[in-house]
Amino acid sequence: AVQLLNLDSTNMEPSHWKLMVHAIWEHYDDFDGFVIAHGTDTLAYTASLLALALSKVEIPVFLVSSQLPLNQEGANGNENFRRSVELICAGIHSGVYVVYRNEDGRCFLHHGGHLVSSGDYSNDFYSRDAVCLGEVSKVMEGECSRAAMHLNQWTEELKRDKICSQRNGNGIDLSRMGELKSDVLCIEPYVGLNYQQIVLNKEIRAVIHGLYHSATACIGGTNEEQKSEYSMLPFLMRCREARIPVIVTPCPNEAAYASGVWMMEAGAVPVYGMTKEMVYVKTLLAGVLGYPNEKLCSFLKEDVCGE
Protein backbone atom coordinates (compact mmCIF):
# COMPACT_ATOMS: atom_id res chain seq x y z
CA ALA A 1 0.00 0.00 0.00
CA VAL A 2 1.15 3.52 -0.80
CA GLN A 3 -0.21 6.54 1.08
CA LEU A 4 0.16 9.19 -1.55
CA LEU A 5 -2.24 11.76 -0.09
CA ASN A 6 -4.17 12.10 3.14
CA LEU A 7 -6.79 14.79 2.71
CA ASP A 8 -10.49 15.47 2.47
CA SER A 9 -11.43 15.04 -1.19
CA THR A 10 -13.17 18.42 -0.96
CA ASN A 11 -9.66 19.91 -0.90
CA MET A 12 -8.55 18.13 -4.08
CA GLU A 13 -6.38 20.27 -6.38
CA PRO A 14 -5.13 19.65 -9.94
CA SER A 15 -1.61 19.06 -8.61
CA HIS A 16 -2.92 16.10 -6.59
CA TRP A 17 -4.18 14.47 -9.78
CA LYS A 18 -0.70 14.72 -11.24
CA LEU A 19 0.70 12.90 -8.20
CA MET A 20 -1.85 10.09 -8.64
CA VAL A 21 -1.08 9.61 -12.31
CA HIS A 22 2.68 9.58 -11.76
CA ALA A 23 2.39 7.14 -8.84
CA ILE A 24 0.42 4.64 -10.92
CA TRP A 25 2.88 4.82 -13.80
CA GLU A 26 5.78 4.49 -11.35
CA HIS A 27 4.37 1.25 -9.86
CA TYR A 28 2.76 0.05 -13.08
CA ASP A 29 4.85 -3.14 -13.38
CA ASP A 30 4.46 -4.14 -9.73
CA PHE A 31 0.75 -4.97 -9.59
CA ASP A 32 -2.12 -6.58 -11.49
CA GLY A 33 -4.42 -3.69 -10.61
CA PHE A 34 -4.82 -0.60 -8.45
CA VAL A 35 -7.39 0.36 -5.83
CA ILE A 36 -7.43 4.04 -4.89
CA ALA A 37 -9.23 5.13 -1.71
CA HIS A 38 -11.02 8.41 -2.43
CA GLY A 39 -13.67 10.61 -0.83
CA THR A 40 -17.10 10.97 -2.39
CA ASP A 41 -17.19 14.75 -2.88
CA THR A 42 -14.87 14.96 -5.90
CA LEU A 43 -14.98 11.29 -6.88
CA ALA A 44 -16.58 11.88 -10.29
CA TYR A 45 -13.94 14.46 -11.24
CA THR A 46 -11.01 12.26 -10.24
CA ALA A 47 -12.53 9.21 -11.95
CA SER A 48 -12.98 11.18 -15.17
CA LEU A 49 -9.45 12.59 -15.05
CA LEU A 50 -7.89 9.18 -14.44
CA ALA A 51 -9.99 7.54 -17.16
CA LEU A 52 -8.31 9.86 -19.65
CA ALA A 53 -4.84 10.11 -18.13
CA LEU A 54 -4.55 6.32 -17.70
CA SER A 55 -6.13 5.36 -21.02
CA LYS A 56 -2.86 3.69 -22.06
CA VAL A 57 -2.48 1.71 -18.83
CA GLU A 58 -3.07 -2.00 -19.47
CA ILE A 59 -4.34 -2.95 -16.00
CA PRO A 60 -7.59 -2.09 -14.18
CA VAL A 61 -7.74 0.87 -11.80
CA PHE A 62 -10.57 1.13 -9.25
CA LEU A 63 -11.57 4.10 -7.11
CA VAL A 64 -13.24 3.18 -3.83
CA SER A 65 -15.27 5.46 -1.57
CA SER A 66 -17.48 5.15 1.49
CA GLN A 67 -20.46 7.30 2.36
CA LEU A 68 -19.73 6.80 6.10
CA PRO A 69 -16.64 6.04 8.21
CA LEU A 70 -15.82 2.35 7.77
CA ASN A 71 -16.45 1.50 11.42
CA GLN A 72 -20.02 2.82 11.33
CA GLU A 73 -22.97 0.53 10.69
CA GLY A 74 -24.28 0.89 7.17
CA ALA A 75 -21.00 2.09 5.66
CA ASN A 76 -20.63 0.84 2.09
CA GLY A 77 -16.85 1.24 1.81
CA ASN A 78 -16.07 -2.34 2.82
CA GLU A 79 -18.28 -3.81 0.14
CA ASN A 80 -17.06 -1.32 -2.47
CA PHE A 81 -13.47 -2.33 -1.72
CA ARG A 82 -14.15 -6.05 -1.69
CA ARG A 83 -15.97 -6.08 -4.98
CA SER A 84 -13.23 -4.01 -6.61
CA VAL A 85 -10.57 -6.52 -5.53
CA GLU A 86 -12.75 -9.43 -6.66
CA LEU A 87 -13.09 -7.96 -10.13
CA ILE A 88 -9.36 -7.34 -10.42
CA CYS A 89 -8.62 -10.92 -9.35
CA ALA A 90 -11.17 -12.22 -11.86
CA GLY A 91 -9.34 -10.51 -14.70
CA ILE A 92 -11.60 -7.60 -15.62
CA HIS A 93 -10.40 -5.62 -18.63
CA SER A 94 -8.07 -2.67 -18.13
CA GLY A 95 -9.73 0.69 -17.56
CA VAL A 96 -10.76 3.03 -14.76
CA TYR A 97 -13.78 1.94 -12.72
CA VAL A 98 -15.82 2.88 -9.66
CA VAL A 99 -17.72 0.29 -7.64
CA TYR A 100 -20.34 1.84 -5.39
CA ARG A 101 -23.31 0.53 -3.38
CA ASN A 102 -26.25 2.91 -3.31
CA GLU A 103 -28.64 3.47 -0.44
CA ASP A 104 -31.13 0.93 -1.84
CA GLY A 105 -28.56 -1.84 -1.30
CA ARG A 106 -27.73 -2.33 -4.97
CA CYS A 107 -24.07 -2.22 -5.93
CA PHE A 108 -23.03 -0.84 -9.32
CA LEU A 109 -19.94 -0.92 -11.49
CA HIS A 110 -19.33 2.41 -13.23
CA HIS A 111 -17.10 3.43 -16.11
CA GLY A 112 -14.91 6.08 -14.45
CA GLY A 113 -15.42 8.49 -17.33
CA HIS A 114 -19.22 8.28 -17.08
CA LEU A 115 -19.69 8.82 -13.35
CA VAL A 116 -21.84 11.78 -12.30
CA SER A 117 -21.48 13.55 -8.96
CA SER A 118 -24.08 12.75 -6.31
CA GLY A 119 -27.20 14.87 -6.33
CA ASP A 120 -28.18 17.20 -3.50
CA TYR A 121 -29.07 15.38 -0.26
CA SER A 122 -28.10 12.03 -1.77
CA ASN A 123 -25.28 9.57 -1.17
CA ASP A 124 -25.94 7.68 -4.41
CA PHE A 125 -23.88 7.66 -7.59
CA TYR A 126 -25.09 7.07 -11.13
CA SER A 127 -23.74 6.71 -14.64
CA ARG A 128 -25.50 6.19 -17.93
CA ASP A 129 -24.37 2.59 -18.45
CA ALA A 130 -23.80 1.35 -14.89
CA VAL A 131 -23.85 -2.42 -14.42
CA CYS A 132 -25.69 -3.74 -11.36
CA LEU A 133 -23.52 -6.23 -9.50
CA GLY A 134 -26.35 -7.41 -7.28
CA GLU A 135 -27.50 -6.80 -3.74
CA VAL A 136 -25.75 -7.58 -0.48
CA SER A 137 -27.34 -6.49 2.77
CA LYS A 138 -24.10 -6.48 4.73
CA VAL A 139 -20.48 -7.40 4.19
CA MET A 140 -18.78 -9.09 7.13
CA GLU A 141 -15.18 -10.16 7.53
CA GLY A 142 -14.77 -13.77 6.41
CA GLU A 143 -18.13 -13.84 4.63
CA CYS A 144 -18.19 -14.32 0.87
CA SER A 145 -20.38 -11.86 -0.98
CA ARG A 146 -22.82 -13.10 -3.58
CA ALA A 147 -20.47 -11.47 -6.05
CA ALA A 148 -17.69 -13.93 -5.25
CA MET A 149 -19.92 -16.95 -5.84
CA HIS A 150 -20.61 -15.92 -9.44
CA LEU A 151 -17.35 -14.12 -10.11
CA ASN A 152 -16.26 -15.89 -13.28
CA GLN A 153 -19.73 -15.61 -14.81
CA TRP A 154 -19.82 -11.92 -13.92
CA THR A 155 -16.46 -11.16 -15.42
CA GLU A 156 -17.22 -12.89 -18.71
CA GLU A 157 -20.48 -10.94 -18.98
CA LEU A 158 -18.75 -7.68 -18.10
CA LYS A 159 -16.08 -8.24 -20.74
CA ARG A 160 -18.86 -8.17 -23.32
CA ASP A 161 -20.43 -5.06 -21.83
CA LYS A 162 -19.65 -1.64 -23.29
CA ILE A 163 -18.61 -0.43 -19.85
CA CYS A 164 -15.41 -2.47 -20.35
CA SER A 165 -14.72 -1.07 -23.83
CA GLN A 166 -12.49 1.75 -22.61
CA ARG A 167 -9.65 0.45 -24.79
CA ASN A 168 -11.73 1.12 -27.91
CA GLY A 169 -10.79 4.79 -27.70
CA ASN A 170 -7.63 6.26 -29.17
CA GLY A 171 -5.94 6.68 -25.78
CA ILE A 172 -3.34 9.29 -24.83
CA ASP A 173 0.06 8.68 -23.27
CA LEU A 174 0.36 10.80 -20.13
CA SER A 175 3.01 8.74 -18.35
CA ARG A 176 5.00 11.97 -18.07
CA MET A 177 2.06 14.30 -17.50
CA GLY A 178 3.04 17.92 -16.97
CA GLU A 179 1.45 20.52 -14.73
CA LEU A 180 -2.31 20.85 -14.70
CA LYS A 181 -3.08 24.56 -14.68
CA SER A 182 -6.25 26.05 -13.23
CA ASP A 183 -7.02 28.01 -16.38
CA VAL A 184 -10.52 26.74 -17.18
CA LEU A 185 -13.50 28.78 -15.97
CA CYS A 186 -16.75 26.91 -15.29
CA ILE A 187 -20.09 28.75 -15.28
CA GLU A 188 -23.46 27.31 -14.29
CA PRO A 189 -26.69 28.94 -15.53
CA TYR A 190 -29.22 30.34 -13.10
CA VAL A 191 -31.96 32.96 -13.17
CA GLY A 192 -30.27 36.34 -12.79
CA LEU A 193 -26.77 35.37 -13.98
CA ASN A 194 -25.16 38.72 -14.84
CA TYR A 195 -22.50 38.21 -17.49
CA GLN A 196 -21.14 41.72 -17.11
CA GLN A 197 -19.83 40.71 -13.68
CA ILE A 198 -17.62 38.01 -15.21
CA VAL A 199 -14.06 39.21 -15.74
CA LEU A 200 -12.12 37.52 -18.53
CA ASN A 201 -8.49 37.84 -17.52
CA LYS A 202 -5.56 36.70 -19.64
CA GLU A 203 -5.08 33.54 -17.55
CA ILE A 204 -8.35 31.99 -18.72
CA ARG A 205 -7.70 29.52 -21.54
CA ALA A 206 -11.25 28.22 -21.95
CA VAL A 207 -14.75 28.60 -20.53
CA ILE A 208 -17.11 25.71 -19.86
CA HIS A 209 -20.70 26.94 -19.68
CA GLY A 210 -23.35 24.64 -18.25
CA LEU A 211 -26.83 24.48 -19.73
CA TYR A 212 -30.33 23.86 -18.47
CA HIS A 213 -31.73 20.34 -18.92
CA SER A 214 -33.08 21.19 -22.40
CA ALA A 215 -29.58 22.26 -23.51
CA THR A 216 -30.43 25.97 -23.32
CA ALA A 217 -29.26 29.14 -21.59
CA CYS A 218 -30.62 32.68 -21.38
CA ILE A 219 -30.11 34.61 -24.59
CA GLY A 220 -33.13 36.93 -24.40
CA GLY A 221 -36.26 36.99 -26.54
CA THR A 222 -36.32 40.41 -28.19
CA ASN A 223 -33.38 42.15 -29.85
CA GLU A 224 -33.08 44.44 -26.85
CA GLU A 225 -33.09 41.54 -24.39
CA GLN A 226 -30.36 39.80 -26.37
CA LYS A 227 -28.07 42.72 -25.57
CA SER A 228 -28.81 42.75 -21.83
CA GLU A 229 -26.46 41.73 -19.03
CA TYR A 230 -28.46 38.51 -18.61
CA SER A 231 -28.00 37.34 -22.19
CA MET A 232 -25.22 34.91 -23.02
CA LEU A 233 -24.76 36.31 -26.53
CA PRO A 234 -22.71 39.44 -25.63
CA PHE A 235 -20.57 37.24 -23.37
CA LEU A 236 -19.89 34.91 -26.29
CA MET A 237 -18.83 37.92 -28.35
CA ARG A 238 -16.43 39.04 -25.61
CA CYS A 239 -14.92 35.57 -25.45
CA ARG A 240 -14.55 35.42 -29.22
CA GLU A 241 -12.72 38.75 -29.23
CA ALA A 242 -10.42 37.45 -26.47
CA ARG A 243 -9.90 34.18 -28.40
CA ILE A 244 -11.31 32.15 -25.50
CA PRO A 245 -13.38 29.14 -26.60
CA VAL A 246 -16.72 28.67 -24.83
CA ILE A 247 -17.71 25.03 -24.50
CA VAL A 248 -21.36 24.33 -23.68
CA THR A 249 -22.51 21.17 -21.92
CA PRO A 250 -24.42 18.95 -21.38
CA CYS A 251 -25.73 18.53 -24.91
CA PRO A 252 -27.58 15.24 -25.46
CA ASN A 253 -27.80 15.86 -29.21
CA GLU A 254 -28.15 18.62 -31.79
CA ALA A 255 -29.81 21.79 -30.47
CA ALA A 256 -33.58 21.35 -30.29
CA TYR A 257 -34.39 24.95 -29.37
CA ALA A 258 -33.74 28.19 -31.25
CA SER A 259 -31.69 29.51 -28.33
CA GLY A 260 -29.28 26.61 -28.79
CA VAL A 261 -28.88 27.39 -32.48
CA TRP A 262 -28.18 31.06 -31.71
CA MET A 263 -25.56 30.08 -29.13
CA MET A 264 -23.73 27.96 -31.70
CA GLU A 265 -23.94 30.70 -34.31
CA ALA A 266 -22.39 33.10 -31.77
CA GLY A 267 -19.42 30.78 -31.32
CA ALA A 268 -20.36 28.34 -28.56
CA VAL A 269 -18.80 24.89 -28.98
CA PRO A 270 -21.23 22.06 -28.15
CA VAL A 271 -19.94 18.80 -26.69
CA TYR A 272 -22.34 15.90 -27.06
CA GLY A 273 -22.80 12.91 -24.80
CA MET A 274 -20.20 13.59 -22.08
CA THR A 275 -20.71 14.45 -18.42
CA LYS A 276 -19.80 17.96 -17.30
CA GLU A 277 -17.09 16.47 -15.09
CA MET A 278 -15.51 14.78 -18.10
CA VAL A 279 -15.74 17.90 -20.26
CA TYR A 280 -13.95 19.89 -17.56
CA VAL A 281 -11.05 17.50 -16.98
CA LYS A 282 -10.65 16.82 -20.70
CA THR A 283 -10.32 20.56 -21.30
CA LEU A 284 -7.70 20.71 -18.52
CA LEU A 285 -5.73 17.89 -20.13
CA ALA A 286 -5.81 19.63 -23.49
CA GLY A 287 -3.74 22.35 -21.83
CA VAL A 288 -1.19 19.79 -20.59
CA LEU A 289 -0.96 18.44 -24.14
CA GLY A 290 -0.34 21.96 -25.43
CA TYR A 291 -3.31 21.97 -27.79
CA PRO A 292 -4.28 25.37 -29.28
CA ASN A 293 -7.93 26.42 -29.42
CA GLU A 294 -8.55 24.78 -32.78
CA LYS A 295 -7.16 21.45 -31.61
CA LEU A 296 -9.04 21.70 -28.29
CA CYS A 297 -12.39 21.64 -30.06
CA SER A 298 -11.49 18.58 -32.12
CA PHE A 299 -9.91 16.86 -29.09
CA LEU A 300 -13.16 17.22 -27.12
CA LYS A 301 -14.94 15.31 -29.89
CA GLU A 302 -12.26 12.61 -30.04
CA ASP A 303 -12.90 9.32 -28.26
CA VAL A 304 -10.01 8.69 -25.85
CA CYS A 305 -11.42 6.12 -23.41
CA GLY A 306 -15.02 5.55 -24.43
CA GLU A 307 -16.05 8.71 -22.63
Locate each region found by the language model.
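Internal, active-site/partner-interface "lid" segment
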Residues: I92-G119, K295-E307
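Short Gly/Thr/Asp-enriched flexible loops that form oxyanion-binding sites at enzyme active sites
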Residues: I36-I59, G220-F235
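Short, acidic/small-residue loops that bind anionic groups at enzyme active sites
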Residues: A47-E79, R83-Y97, R240-P250
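Gly/Ser/Thr-rich loops at beta-strand to alpha-helix junctions
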Residues: I36-A44, D104-G105, Y212-T216, P252-A255
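C-terminal non-catalytic interaction/assembly regions of soluble proteins
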Residues: L211-E307
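ATP/NTP phosphate-donor binding region
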Residues: A1-E26, E254
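Accessory alpha-helical/coil subdomains and C-terminal extensions
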Residues: F108-G221, S228
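Structural motif
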Residues: D32-F34, A206
